[in-house]
Every structure is written in C-alpha cells, then in structure tokens.
A protein has these predicted regions:
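Transmembrane alpha-helical segments of polytopic membrane transport and secretion proteins
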Residues: 1-55, 303-319
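A short amphipathic helical element positioned immediately N-terminal to and/or at the very start
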Residues: 33-46, 97-100, 108, 225, ...
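Structural signature of transmembrane alpha-helix termini at the membrane-water interface
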Residues: 41, 63-73, 139, 194, ...
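Alpha-helical transmembrane segments of integral membrane proteins
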Residues: 48-58, 102-319
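Phosphate/oxyanion-binding loops and surfaces in catalytic or ligand/nucleic-acid-binding neighborhoods
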Residues: 59, 65-72, 235, 247, ...
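Primarily residues marking transmembrane-helix entry/exit sites
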Residues: 36, 50-57, 220, 232, ...
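Hydrophobic alpha-helical transmembrane segments of membrane transport/permease proteins
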Residues: 2-8, 12-14, 55, 63-100, ...
C-alpha cells in the first residue's frame, strides 16, 4: 500500500543520512544484555575479587536450583548397610564425600539442600528489610520535622538492641517457621537501611535539579520517586549486597540456638548446632563442612558488596 514503509526498507532522515528502518527501532532486550555485559566487564577488569565472588554466588544459586539433581542422596533418607542398619558417622570417603551424620544421612546432600534455605532467607529477608528501610528513609529524609523526629527515634530504639537479640525476642514470641525468620531478619535490616537512605536523601535534596522539579510544579511524591529514588539506588544496592551475608549469619545463629527452621529441614546452622556440636570430638567433619559453606558464602557476599561500593561510589572510583 502506498504510504507504508516496509520493515526492511531504507529511509532518509532529516539530515540526509540513510538508515535501515528495522535497525532504527529500539531493541530493549539487546540493550539490556549489553548493559549487563558492560557492567560485568567493568567488574572483572577493576575488581577481580568481586567478580570471583559473583561467580561463586552464581554457582551457589545454580546448586540451590538443581539440588534434586546434584545431591547424591536423599537428604532425609537413612542410608543403610547390608544388614539394614544406618551407616552412622561414616567419615568422608569415596561413597560419602562429606561423610554421614548419626542417623546415616549424607552430609553433602544436606549441605546442598541447605543452600536453598540460606538463599531463600537471605534474598527474601533482605528484600523486605531493604524495601521497608528505603520507604522509611525516603519519608524521613524528604519530609523533615516532626515526621523525621518520630521515625528516627523509632529507628534509634531498634538499633539500640543488637540484631541477634531482637531476632531472638521476636522469634520466641512468633514461633519457629521459615516465614517468621524471614520477617524477623527483615525487621533487623530495616533500621540500618533506613538510616543510610535518609542520609542519601538529605544529600540529594541539596542539588539544583530538585529545586527545578519543585519549581516546575512536581508533587512531592513525584520528586521522591522520579528524582531522588533513582539517585539513591547505588547505596541501596550496596546495603542489600552486604546484608545478604549478614542475613545468612543471623539465620545460622538462630538455627544454632534452636530457634531456626524446624527439623527435619536441612539448614547449615541447624547442622552446626545439632550433629556438629554433639559430635565435635568424634566427628568434627559434621561441623567443618557446614561452617565452611557459611564462611565462603558470607565472605563472597561481603567481597561483592565492597566491590560494588568501590565501583558505584564516585569518591572511590579512582582506586
């Protein structure tokens, strides 16, 4: 039909430059992948330890997703010998790479399945805590005065208590469940996130583009969501990456104290507090392997958080 340009046709632009109409269309998925690849390339070049940490964490995610495929045995099943008795406290060998616990269950399989609980608790609790803390920080930083005073006094009260003590108190009241643990850890994260976001908002408010948006008639919430929040994304991302490791440590501590995810669900902290602590002298591998898993994951999250901070903070980009 006349007047229509085929997708493969070439057209002449306003400056006389010929271009392909199909290529001129935006390709969001391609641009998204290009942005991700660009960010990864910068991370590898400038912060190789951060890139290695990201690789370790990606491997952990793959292990958690493919746990039914990668685990050599059922983590809940008692492995029996020829006489039908559980293979108890078998040290690491070719058949059981990380040994067996007092009930004959494979330790490696329980560690693999325990990564699921750690990741679920880590990502879910950090998401809840970061969202809540970001909301409180935005409101407190932009609307100063009485609102700021009330919110910050509440934040000071929560931060006066050690995080693990607050988590113990709330879990003791709400009871043991995975959902309660996620909510409790999110509640522990929120005050610190709120304080960081508030400071960032107070700094961003001093820029002239905020005054320009206000003069143009933008509503307060539009200024907060369209101008302040995008510029506060870098500190929020750094907080989340660092708190992921802390959330896993808190979950392991609660499990170690008997207030974590109830058995028989395998968790790294539960393995430390249960079989690992009771058999530390006779079978130290029951505590070594779960403890090593916790240490590696927390170290990887902390190193990734440091790398992101150095890359996103303008004051540290020259390092």
């Amino acid at each position: 039909m006349p007047g229509l340009i085929p997708e493969s046709a070439t057209v002449k632009g306003p400056q006389g430059v010929r271009r392909d109409a199909l290529k001129a269309r935006p390709r969001l998925p391609l641009r998204l992948w290009q942005g991700v690849w660009w960010a990864l390339s910068i991370l590898v070049r400038r912060k190789p330890l951060g890139a290695a940490s990201a690789l370790i964490l990606c491997g952990l995610v793959v292990v958690a997703i493919l746990a039914p495929v990668l685990a050599p045995y059922d983590p809940y099943k008692f492995n029996l010998n020829e006489r039908g008795l559980p293979i108890r406290l078998q040290p690491p060998n070719a058949k059981f790479l990380c040994g067996t616990d007092p009930l004959g269950r494979d330790v490696l399989s329980r560690i693999v399945y325990g990564s699921r609980v750690s990741l679920i608790v880590g990502f879910a609790s950090v998401a809840i805590g970061t969202l809540l803390g970001t909301l409180l920080g935005l409101v407190s930083g932009y609307w100063e005065g009485g609102v700021d005073q009330v919110l910050q006094r509440a934040v000071d009260t929560m931060m006066a208590l050690p995080g693990i003590v607050l988590a113990l108190a709330v879990v003791s009241v709400l009871g043991q469940s995975l959902t309660n643990i996620i909510l409790v850890i999110g509640l522990v994260i929120a005050p610190g996130a709120s304080r960081v976001v508030r400071g960032t908002v107070l700094s961003i408010k001093q820029n002239t583009f905020i005054d320009a948006a206000y003069a143009a008639g933008a509503t307060p919430w539009r200024i907060v969501l369209r101008h302040i929040l995008p510029n506060a994304f870098a500190p929020i991302l750094i907080i989340a990456s660092v708190w992921l490791g802390n959330a896993i440590v808190i979950e392991a501590a609660l499990s170690f104290l008997g207030l974590g995810t109830p058995p028989p669900t395998p968790t790294w902290g539960g393995m430390l507090s249960g079989e690992g602590r009771r058999n530390l002298e006779t079978a130290p591998y029951l505590a070594i392997f779960p403890g090593l898993a916790i240490s590696i994951v927390v170290l990887a999250f902390n190193m990734l958080g440091d790398a992101l901070r150095d890359l996103l903070d303008p004051r540290l980009r020259t390092r």
